[in-house]
Amino acid sequence: MRVKTDVFNINNRACKVYRNTCDSDSVKYVIVQGVDREWLGRENVNVEIPPARGQRVDREWLGRENVNAEISPAHVQAIDSEQLSNAASASDNVRFLDREAGKIMEKAGTGIVFANFGVGSWNDELSPWSAEAVFKNQPFSGRAQETLEFVTDVFVPELVKRYGLPADAKVIIGGYSLAGLFSLWAAYRTDIFYAVAAVSPSVWFPGWIEFAQENHVHSDKIYLSLGNREERTNNRVMSRVGDNIRLQKEIFDGQGIPSVLEWNEGNHFRDVEERVAKGFLWTILQ
């Protein structure tokens, strides 16, 4: 199936959308994902600018090429470029998104809009509240609420308008690492998301487990995963990730929230695109 790729700017954020169908009524899922701006590439010949908004496209954020693949339901996902920077070059990062979209769409068996929006400062825009630095002397400023408001009040409504999406299309949010934590947190803050794919989420984040114990998610189902070597780190805070994700699963079980915790082979940097695609597919197929 041929995949159409659109690139545009909204509120000074670059956006890249993959679609496996032009029939809006056949779209069953919308996947929204926040990604580091550099993962969106540097150029694209099929740039689409919303005439009503008159927005200019930041070409440094645009992808290099369109791809042919099958795409799954629309997801929102954020990718931590800081933690994944050793995985690939900038061009490889663009292809990473293409491959991830292809893996999801190949197996989903339904119409999907896979929508990515650019994230500038990872620690600032995806952290739910302020916290001291845990690594590399980079503190967290806690601006996730601003990012969530962009997703719920601007990005998703724009997708619905731009592509004429049906009212019953389910919105899935997900991401890797700190983006996975952001996705979990978002499900506690709003009921717009049908499901969450939290892949290797940063549940070591200071105060997270206390927050999860005192609140209740609004999504129908949650996917959790972690590499079986991720908790083996000398970083005292980040080494809590294993115990905390087990506690997170227990919290969901106690609250009657359908969820799964899947353990993957390897550390935090292994098989990232496969892990993320697998997480999104679980939210669609289970």
List where the protein language model places each region.
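The conserved beta1-alpha1 loop
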Residues: 32-34, 200, 226
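A conserved short beta-strand
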Residues: 192-203
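Active-site signature of alpha/beta-hydrolase-fold catalytic machinery across serine-
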Residues: 185-189
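Proline/glycine-enriched tight loop/beta-turn segments at coil->beta junctions
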Residues: 21-29
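N-terminal cap/lid segment of alpha/beta-hydrolase-fold proteins
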Residues: 1-22
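Gly/Ala-rich beta-loop-alpha elbow adjacent to hydrolase catalytic centers
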Residues: 174-179, 183
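Serine-hydrolase catalytic machinery in alpha/beta-hydrolase-like enzymes
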Residues: 28-51, 60, 64, 72-75, ...
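The feature captures the conserved acid-bearing segment of alpha/beta-hydrolase catalytic domains
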Residues: 203-283
